[in-house]
């Protein structure tokens, strides 16, 4: 038994030079088996993201033994982080960026990954641009702002479209339904099963009746509902509805063919081709394609520095500058 443990220990303590040799042989084999003119050529067909995913998804059962499993992990990690090319700081950047993307809400994860940020600083800048866009003239539906956007836009607009005389009966029916459903709850432990089943049937029939009443009101105002939906689609602000197939429809740019999952993102992208810059600075008349960029530009006139370092108190006008500054503190703290 001790002999086996000793052998395993020697395998686990293999040097990085041995692993590098394995990597070199593997890379040479890949390139020899690939046609240089083929689209599957090693240097162009495999990206660091591919190796990152393989590294994270690799399972012990995918290898014949512990030695092969460890060697494969070394190989995939090496191909992902590329220590022969990247500095220690760049490798840390990749690891931190991966974890940062992992903790984002799923909607934001998908959006950020489509834009392929190269580092954490670029990712933060992109997310802050989105946050500012939410407060600007164009409201964009986004992950954690979903409830805010729905609350801010939907109730007021729907109220304007539907007359109050039609909304009130629905409200009263819902209130009545709530009271009646409460009254159906059994308060006596000795109530027979037949009574419970009867109450359940009453709840079901009541729910069906209310659903039909609400559906009738919505159908009576079909043209107004279409107007409401069309307005938000034009502005690129149509909110995602669960189970709505139209939301999944992809938006394609006619100029370059790039695909977007949201019409709002397509509208912003099309300004690159059209050169449209609807946001102008009041001070110098310089125009910008996005309101978020205009907000950053205005700080050059006002001297506003909203981003403050908690370690030394130094303030910055842009988050990217604060991000670079914070790295210096981190490097000083790390021995």
From Swiss-Prot:
This is Zinc finger protein 396. It comes from Homo sapiens (Human). Keywords: Cytoplasm, DNA-binding, Metal-binding, Nucleus, Repeat, Repressor, Transcription, Transcription regulation, Zinc, Zinc-finger. CDD domains: SCAN (cd07936). It holds the Pfam family SCAN. PANTHER family: PROTEIN ZBED8-RELATED, SCAN DOMAIN-CONTAINING PROTEIN 3. Belongs to the krueppel C2H2-type zinc-finger protein family. SUPFAM superfamilies: beta-beta-alpha zinc fingers, Retrovirus capsid dimerization domain-like. GO terms for biological process: negative regulation of DNA-templated transcription; regulation of transcription by RNA polymerase II. Disulfide bonds: none annotated. Expressed strongly in liver, moderately in skeletal muscle and weakly in kidney, pancreas, spleen and prostate. Transmembrane segments: none annotated. PROSITE patterns: SCAN_BOX, ZINC_FINGER_C2H2_1, ZINC_FINGER_C2H2_2.
């Amino acid at each position: 038994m001790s002999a086996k443990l000793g052998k395993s220990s020697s395998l686990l303590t293999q040097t990085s030079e041995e692993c590098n040799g394995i990597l070199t042989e593997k890379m040479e084999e890949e390139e020899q088996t690939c046609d240089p003119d083929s689209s599957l050529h090693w240097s162009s067909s495999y990206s660091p993201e591919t190796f990152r995913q393989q590294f994270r998804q690799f399972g012990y059962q995918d290898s014949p033994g512990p030695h092969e499993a460890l060697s494969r992990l070394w190989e995939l990690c090496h191909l992902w982080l590329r220590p022969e090319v990247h500095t220690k700081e760049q490798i840390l950047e990749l690891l931190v960026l991966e974890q940062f993307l992992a903790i984002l809400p799923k909607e934001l994860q998908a959006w950020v990954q489509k834009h392929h940020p190269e580092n954490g600083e670029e990712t933060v800048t992109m997310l802050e641009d989105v946050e500012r866009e939410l407060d600007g003239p164009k409201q964009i539906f986004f992950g954690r702002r979903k409830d805010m956007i729905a609350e801010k836009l939907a109730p007021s607009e729907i109220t304007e479209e539907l007359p109050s005389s039609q909304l009130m009966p629905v409200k009263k029916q819902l209130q009545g339904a709530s009271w009646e459903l409460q009254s159906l709850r059994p308060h006596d432990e000795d109530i027979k099963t037949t009574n419970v089943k009867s109450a359940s049937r009453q709840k079901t029939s009541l729910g069906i009746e209310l659903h039909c009443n609400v559906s009738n009101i919505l159908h009576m105002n079909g043209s107004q509902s279409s107007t409401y939906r069309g307005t938000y689609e034009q502005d690129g602000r149509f909110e995602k509805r669960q189970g709505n197939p139209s939301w999944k429809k992809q938006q394609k740019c006619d100029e370059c063919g790039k695909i977007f999952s949201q019409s709002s993102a397509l509208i912003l992208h099309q300004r690159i081709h059209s050169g449209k810059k609807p946001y102008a600075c009041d001070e110098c008349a310089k125009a910008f394609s996005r309101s978020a960029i205009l907000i950053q530009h205005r700080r050059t006139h006002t001297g506003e520095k909203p981003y403050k370092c908690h370690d030394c108190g130094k303030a910055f006008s842009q988050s990217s500058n604060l991000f670079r500054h914070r790295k210096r503190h981190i490097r000083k703290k790390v021995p």
